[in-house]
Amino acid sequence: MPENRMSRLSNQYHDWARSHPTAAVDFRTAIEDLLNDAGIIFDRVSTRVKTWPSLKAKAKKRGENGDFVYPQPWDEIHDVMGVRVTLYHSTAIPEALDVFGESFKVERSVDKAAETRISGGFGYGSHHLVLTVTEDSAAAMEELAAYVGWTFEVQIRTVLQHAWAEFEHDIRYKQGPNPPSPEVDRLFTCLLYTSDAADE
């Protein structure tokens, strides 16, 4: 029953949150140290634990066939712990990907910018990783000792990509019921080309 499913998810989420009250700080500290030790210069590492209302809304999503997108939400939603790494230049992204690949088990790696280009659209660049903390991860990063087996999501962006994403979200897509005009779309497309060139 859907109610039992959501009740179970609520118990799982709140039990985990109570057991790991410093999760956001633990992951931020561990990843900052990881990048520093690897010699990667970064702007910032930000972390957040997904709120219960946000998790509940995601767990209720259904596909076109009416089935739940996440039948087992606690096991299938991987951004309860979310990490964002902001780098100064795009050339550092492959280095960061290598460091994460060596330090965690990589469940999924997606280049969002490449996906957008392949589909013929436009959008900000961002690389998304789904990672799992292993015994080796915890041995190297003592802050993560309590999270062995835990899966989390990492977004890697440059400072420019991050600024673009925030700007586009606030100006282009938060327009209420009125869609942006063709002039606005053309302006954003031109700005995107300019920002891509600058990031290279």
What residue spans do the PLM features occupy?
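Short, glycine/charge-rich beta-strand/loop segments that flank catalytic centers
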Residues: 46-51, 110-128
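Short, conserved charged micro-motifs
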Residues: 92-97
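Flexible glycine-rich active-site/ligand-binding loops centered on an Asp-His dyad
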Residues: 150-159, 165-192
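A common structural junction motif
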Residues: 101-108, 175
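Charge-rich, low-complexity segments
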Residues: 1-80, 87, 91
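Internal, well-ordered alpha/beta segment that forms a basic, Gly-enriched binding/recognition surface
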Residues: 119-168
